[in-house]
Amino acid sequence: MLYGAMTRPLLLLALAATALAPRAGAEPAPAPDPLAFVDPMIGTGPEGHTFPGATAPFGMVQLSPDTDATCRIRDCYAHAAGYSYHDPTIQGFSHTHFSGAGHSDLGDILVMPQVGDVKLDPGDPAAPGSGYRQPFSHESETASPGYYAVTLSGSGIRAELTAGTRVGIHRYSFPAGRDAHLLIDLRSSLYDYPGKILWSGLHMRPDGTLTGFRETRGWAPGRKLYFAMRFSAPLRGHAFIDRDEAIPYKGFQGPGRGSDALAEKLGKALEARMDFGPLAAPLEVRVALSGVDEAGAIANLDAEGADFDTVRTRTQAAWREALHAVEIEAPAPMRTNIYTALYHALLAPSVWSDADGRYRGPDDQVHVAKDFTFRSTFSLWDTFRAEHPLLTLIQPARTTSDIVNSLIASRRESPDGILPVWQFAGRETWTMIGYHAVPVIADAYLKGIGGFDADAALEAMVASATYAPYGGLGDYMRLGYVPIDREPEAASKTVEYAYDDWTIARMARAMGKADIAARFERRAGNWRNSFDAKSGWLRARLADGRFRTPFDPTAINYGSDYTEGNAWQYSWFVPQDQAALFALLGGDGKAIAKLDAMFDYDVSKLDYSHAEDIAGLIGQYIHGNEPSHHVAYLYVHAGAPWRTQARLRQIVESQYRPTPDGLSGNDDLGQMSAWLVFTALGFYPVTPGSNQYVIGRPFVERAVLNLPGGKRFTVETQGLSDANPYVGRVELNGAPLARTWIGDAEIRAGGTLRFVMQAMPNRDWGRARAARPYSRSTADE
């Protein structure tokens, strides 16, 4: 079945949202509240790596429970977001998390409420009471956009979380008559290892504001984070505790009641204990973050740190506005999948500048964002494909111009002078391959997004594409490919560089920079240098020109010829010129047969357990990782869109469910989710930079895109059901649409795209070459 069953809590929300549907003849009811159809628990199982906690759209703060932050880096994959649904205990509530990343860090400033004797260590999950971690039940959990709550069953404390852009607000209801305490553990960190905390500090200010910082050498070395924290109840006492036994403090004791009740403490293993005594009302803890300094955190707290209910109401309103960009009519489980996917797609790139515009850049210096908001958390190898095109389409232009301005500023401040590769907290991690900030900028420019210096952007793009020390680029510029005997993952790098080069050429041509355009148009064809005509695969070559042997198209190994994949996935990565690739494969028929072989491949005898990112397999199609994401749409390029329609159904049915285990792979900062949003609407950006969306098939009965500028673009379906999975015909604004793509400008202009569904394939629609989507070798440019 296409649509599964809803979880009970979400079903109740959905029923509540639609209970006021009008009777015949009554006035139309307002559109259902989209918050009722978002389930942040989706993807919190072992593969999705999403978090259930509270955050605002693109918020700096992601306030969420951590179920295990004690595991060491190589054992933590299921806990990349801090929370894993199948864990029985909560270790605490920390303020920073990635959504769906395949690697991790963060988990900053962990707070844990306690009663009675204060425990200073988390303890063993298998030994209740051995530390401050607490058991909990999912029946006591509530999660919705901007709000999370749970009861810690070991103590009876009710914990509630909400968040604004730069603040997180905790609300703890303690059992009556019990002494209330908070433990703040600056040692706790996701993907931890010995020595990760370089330095940290705690400072109790005269007005009762607790401030502090820590510097870590995790995924982003030298990352600094500052915080400010205020409490709604007066403190009876506090203690700053240094747990560093390896390097005990040898200096003189500062003033204070005892050795721990100090105004300030510095060290590598700090904790703070806040004591309140019995409380008659819930305790609110208001926390703001800054990447700049403690003064910045205090200013952010002053700017946004209202009471819990005010912040929750404000953030829920922001989520309603953001989610209202797409109105969905679909059966409840599908609607939940799509709205949750949209929610996940609106979490990053996250705000990194303070309320006053200051931010810490890639050079570890403080800068000021003038007339834009600096954003970070760029998982560009993943998100250039669909996440950024989705934001460009449904978010106000300011969001994308902020992103582009942040990329340009990062290049200007980078010690290497290039655009980000995988950046968070303003720091480069050098994770993954390509220079995929380039297609993000080009796609925005070509779609008419302004608000940034196009000349500076193009200069940054060219600088990134010609930086010889990076990823074999020196050899790529000299040989026309990356040689595998000099650089790992060379086949993947060659084809991805060629695509990025094509987007530079497109933008340069549109700007009238003919010399730059010609140079990168030549480079855009470099993928051909990796094509092995004898085998029909895109392969890695040696510096002397020979293809590397032995060769196994099914082999997946880190640091091999390909990046997180094999020849089956990467031999389709020529988004700028699929027609030329199909010609080399022997024509449309051969390409279709090879696509079918990919999906139908029997992988039962292959072992990919060593490759943690390889998940969501349908044959050799791997939906749980990004290189496959465009592949189902390639049948359209071969004149067989009906086969795309069948494959999309196969993927959507098997890879997305409204459950904690409902994502087949890492959400990767919104890319897995953006794929579903586009696909459910009936089209997908196979080639960002072409200004085209390839038409697939819809999974909604009706959808309305409320576009920036007040335009509305409607997707309508007739006859959509499990019995009618194929597109019979497509109409755009009432006229038959013979081509199998729709232009970005056509969507932005507003109108209606109508699908008539039927039981059997329409094998004629889209067969003609003139009807097919963009390919460089056949385009009239």
Residue spans for each PLM region:
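Accessory carbohydrate-recognition regions in carbohydrate-active enzymes
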Residues: 27-439, 445-495, 508-529, 535-538, ...
